[in-house]
Amino acid sequence: MASPSSFSSQNYKFNVFASFHGPDVRKTLLSHIRLQFNRNGITMFDDQKIVRSATIGPSLVEAIKESRISIVILSKKYASSSWCLDELVEILECKKAMGQIVMTIFYGVDPSDVRKQIGKFGIAFNETCARKTEEERQKWSKALNQVSNIAGEDFLRWDNEAIMIEKIARDVLDKLNATPSRDFDGMVGIEAHLREIKSLLDLDNVEVKIVAIAGPAGIGKTTIARALYGLLSKRFQLSCFVDNLRGSYHSGFDEYGFKLHLQEQFLSKVLNQSGMRICHLGAIKENLSDQRVLIILDDVNKLKQLEALANETTWFGPGSRIVVTTENKELLQQHGINNTYHVGFPSDEDALKILCSYAFKQTSPRHGFEELSESVTKLCGKLPLGLCVVGSSLRGKKEDEWEDVVTRLETILDQDIEDVLRVGYESLDENAQTLFLHIAIFFNKEDGDLVKTMFAESDLDVKYGLKILENRSLIKMKIFSNGDTKIVMHRLLQQMGKRAIQKQEPWERQILIDAREICHVLEHAKGTGWNVHGMSFDISRISEVSIRKKAFKRMPNLQFLKVYKSKDDGNNRMHVPEEMDFPCLLRLLDWKAYPSKSLPPTFNPEHLVELNMHSSQLEYLWQGTQPLKNLKKMDLSQSKNLKQLPDLSNATNLEYLYLMGCESLIEIPSSISHLHKLEMLATVGCINLEVIPAHMNLESLQTVYLGGCSRLRNIPVMSTNIRYLFITNTAVEGVPLCPGLKTLDVSGSRNFKGLLTHLPTSLTTLNLCYTDIERIPDCFKSLHQLKGVNLRGCRRLASLPELPRSLLTLVADDCESLETVFCPLNTLKASFSFANCFKLDREARRAIIQQSFFMGKAVLPGREVPAVFDHRAKGYSLTIRPDGNPYTSFVFCVVVSRNQKSDKTIPPSLLWRRIIAQDEGYPVEVWNRIGDVFKYRTEHLLIFHFDFLEFDNRDIVFEFSSESHDFDIIECGAKVLAEKSIKESYESGSDQAFEDDVVFEPSKAFGDEKYGDCCIL
């Protein structure tokens, strides 16, 4: 096993040096500490062979310098030894010069006695100093004062010495392992991954635990596992990283022989004994059952591998940890591994940082490469492997070379990336491979039930296939709040699927994707055959083509037809004959920019499940009634010439009807009343739509989008089961009765001036922004499920009534007439924004600020930190010196002003850092997204609450900054809170707890200057 010191950035010989007075602690506390440290693999300097003298010798000074941590055990007689005091001075010198970590244990003495050299400790100190010079006395006194201010363990406060010693050992291990090995320094997001996995590992638990790291190929599982190994291996007696297990299967062995072979390789590595030979499968248990081990099993893809190397937890000693990385979640279920960390894709911000770290060796784009970097990040789909490979290939390249790479990435998959991703695909059986390819080409981001219906008449086991693909991390089944499940495949996996099709022999292909090959077939009506089930091609990459009437005659089994345009240049490159014969078995017809005014009269939609004619030239689909029993989804969006919908009486299974941007559509036909399974209706942007049939009861209809239907004045009751109603930018004046409504959005509907007398109590989200509403009804407080309200730009709204306690978000920006709000605003953990509300009266401002004390956030105009914040400072930095009373949280107030040079439209972020005096750890950094600072007309107050996990009595420095420099920080302030008083005040519904604190001085907290007719701060 590698010693803990071997992983440090400096070569330390010992983990710990202990400074102590032998007669006080050697046979008691110190002996117990040594025993615990030995159990945990912590090496501590042993001073028993050193001869004590009047001064500490070179060997002891060297031992102090060669130790990563010094533990000072301050006992009653510690100061009676000049040796101990000289040790202490040397230790503090090493702390200052070398960054040595110093920990303290107060063993039977009060820290204040040590600090002031009083009591029995002071008597011993004075006796020692009586024989010394004043210079030595001052030197020792200063050292004792410094060490007493280092937070440590106070023996008198512990009821159980053993538990205290266990905690000390854990603290030592945490400090030894405070950061990963330098191999992973600067790796974006690695700390967050390690923090989550360490939580699952529960390292203080003596049970043996198996934890998995799961995710798709290229997500970074192995990298995370290696960083974890570097971070934790020194905590264990034995450790081993077993890599590339995927390639460990040898066909020359039977199952027993394979497991035996794998165990031999494993034990040879973990025990550092090359060429081990074993004769039975109990060898791991025989060798490791009494050892605390850390084992990483990387890239596991067979259950046999787990059965061979970690079949039972009893094979390993107490406290052992086994970490498995895999793409196969089903394998984890089969082996009974329930503790799994699922590696997710990085955020947009982190993905850009990852790319830049490889392309520029920094975390942000070089000047002039900002847009190109964002384009590459998007094309890589935020997959860390893709960002790494592509970023490295771009290092040192010029802008025009970057542009070439961006163009190539749109259609071509890098070979190194393909090699990694293809492994998972090739491990699938034929059924799963077929389904994978169909999803990659036709059904990415489609509804799961819809896809199952697509294959209802085939032999393909879609339900089982989807489960396999999800378990292998090749797709993700994304579940939405309304219960819908969509199939999501990563963009690079899609490209890999296309490459897999291109590598097939022409006569083997069930799916055609080569645009030139397909156009040749359609133009000359020859080639292909019975086995072709799908066709998908990009018409933006071809010249003009005229399709023959019998083009699909040789493809009788064609079920999936997709014609799309990756670049919409407005040109119609395809010419379709009026009487073209579509395949009669079509289940998917997805044709973007269809060039004809209608579908051919011979078109038979009997088997059709989805009809998608986005941006078509259609004026109508067909005449008369058609058999539509299988149709579940119809999308005619952006068909600007569409004047009428067909008779939909037979579409009794239709669930989704999308008509966005159908600008010529005037009326929804009455046949829609037969669509009893319709769940969603979307007519956004139908600017000429005037009529929606009345007297309908579409019992399945839950979501209705009517935004931008500027001529629509009346909305009938379409269903009493509507949950989500969006009627933005319309001419409507009222809302139909929907007793189960959850979301109501009438933003931008200027004719809408009043709410229903009784809003449904089921409402969770309400958007009234940019309406002429003047009053909100008193029933508002009874909406106990309401979570979010948007009143932005309601310029006539003068007051806010009592709000429900369930409210989490209230946006009232630019409410120019708003003066009063109901007091108090007792809403726990709520975020309130009153940007540019310059008419707020004194009581309203007081209520808004007070609300933030309930673990909330607030934004409102202001030039100075209000007097209620008892710690205030000019500029961006604030130091707080706790008064000794326990606190659990702070409320911060920051005065910001928009940087006039900023022209960004992306909401900037406020970064704040907590730095504790003499703390060896890293500062705590927290990002707070602060909204549209670029819209603030003057200075504003940003108020937010933050909890601390533990009380600390040392000085704390808080620093606030804007990484993007989009705003300036004028002032900052903070108020220390005790959790009990906040909780009691919230539960009582009063503001009594703040009466003494929230005393606003108008001359200080509120300015008297005028901004036009508005009082500003």
UniProtKB/Swiss-Prot annotation:
The keyword Nucleotide-binding applies. Keywords: ATP-binding, Hydrolase, Leucine-rich repeat, NAD, Nucleotide-binding, Plant defense, Repeat. Residues 191-447 form the NB-ARC domain. Its EC number is 3.2.2.6. It comes from the Eukaryota. GO terms for molecular function: ADP binding; ATP binding; ATP hydrolysis activity; NAD+ nucleosidase activity, cyclic ADP-ribose generating. Residues 12-176 form the TIR domain. Pfam families: LRR_3, NB-ARC, TIR, WHD_ROQ1. The keyword Hydrolase applies. The TIR domain mediates NAD(+) hydrolase (NADase) activity. Self-association of TIR domains is required for NADase activity. This is Disease resistance protein RML1B. It comes from Arabidopsis thaliana (Mouse-ear cress). The lineage of its organism: Eukaryota, Viridiplantae, Streptophyta, Embryophyta, Tracheophyta. The gene is RLM1B.
